[in-house]
Design a protein with these regions (language model features):
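ATP-binding pocket architecture of kinase catalytic cores
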Residues: 31-189, 193, 197-206
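Catalytic-loop of the protein kinase fold
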Residues: 207-209, 214
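All-alpha amphipathic helical-bundle segments outside canonical DNA-binding/catalytic cores
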Residues: 278-286
Length: 286
């Protein structure tokens, strides 16, 4: 969007929120936050009736994106962790219609903190230990969230512990083949190996973030202030999140410290203690 069109969108957003929350906001500014694969994300600054400014995060569905996800799933996943020890933004509203602002969207309050590049091995220096402990502890808390009261569990189709890996593998194989412009021999070889070497059934069904890693959380000093990007959340095997967060993709320059935080053994110990889940190493590798 050009600057003028973006400012018009910001004013329309202000008008919408004023009506929705029954208070008068004044539009101050709007800025695009780049980097997401599935949403247009904006920071919108508004002034309330008491002349106090407040930043809102406005996540808007795109016509095309690298990853096709349902915005309601993202919103509901956030809702499962409101006012818990898993730090997430406070939700304001989900609008599933395109009638209001031209596309479905969700609105959240902005959290303090910054997001680091997942490829910067010094991003968390000198607080790798403190941030690392929180990072793996929070992932354990996500895995241990009770599904009985989970809104996400009520929203999504039921899974069972025996078919978690098959359903996820089939989903991503379909995405890869749909988006490929031709045969991908290396990917097809990897797919065949994954089908041949399926892991054990999940020891527990849990909320799975879907993209839990460095680069997808906010931090300020030595504190993790927010877990972001829940658009791929689902119910499944918690080892999926654990394996992805441990992946050498996110620590290729210092492979002994996953996510460029703390040593692997220490990370696994924190996660296991918090989640109370016994992990099978072969399944984790898968």
């Amino acid at each position: 969007m050009e600057e003028n069109a973006t400012n018009i969108l910001g004013q329309e957003f202000s008008d919408f929120l004023s009506s929705k929350l029954n208070q008068q906001f004044k539009f101050l500014s709007i800025h695009r936050i780049f980097g997401g694969a599935s949403r247009e994300t904006y920071r919108v600054k508004l002034q309330d009736e008491e002349k106090k400014s407040q930043n809102f995060i406005y996540r808007r569905t795109q016509d095309s994106s690298l990853i096709e996800t349902d915005q309601k799933t993202e919103y509901v996943a956030y809702s499962d962790f409101q006012d818990t020890e898993v730090p997430v933004p406070k939700l304001i509203v989900l609008e599933e219609s395109s009638d209001k602002l031209g596309a479905p969207f969700l609105v959240m309050e902005e959290l303090s903190g910054v997001v680091a590049s997942p490829f910067d091995k010094e991003a968390y220096n000198p607080y790798q230990a403190e941030i690392g402990e929180q990072f793996w502890k929070i992932l354990g808390k996500i895995a241990s969230r009770d599904l009985g009261s989970s809104n996400l569990n009520k929203l999504l189709p039921n899974k069972n512990k025996n078919d978690c890996c098959t359903k996820e593998l089939n989903y991503w194989v379909n995405v890869i083949r749909k988006d490929s412009i031709g045969i991908e021999p290396i990917l097809e070889a990897a797919i065949r190996e994954l089908f041949r070497s399926k892991p054990l059934p999940a020891s527990r069904l849990s909320i799975v973030h879907g993209d839990y890693r460095n680069g997808n959380f906010l931090f300020e000093g030595k504190h993790v202030t927010g877990i972001l990007d829940w658009e791929m959340a689902h119910i499944g095997d918690p080892l999926e999140d654990l394996g992805w967060a441990l992946s050498e993709i996110w620590c290729w320059e210092k492979k002994e410290t996953p996510a460029y935080l703390i040593p692997r053994k220490e990370a696994l110990g924190i996660w296991t203690q918090e989640s109370q889940i016994e992990k099978d190493e072969d399944s984790l590798l898968w």
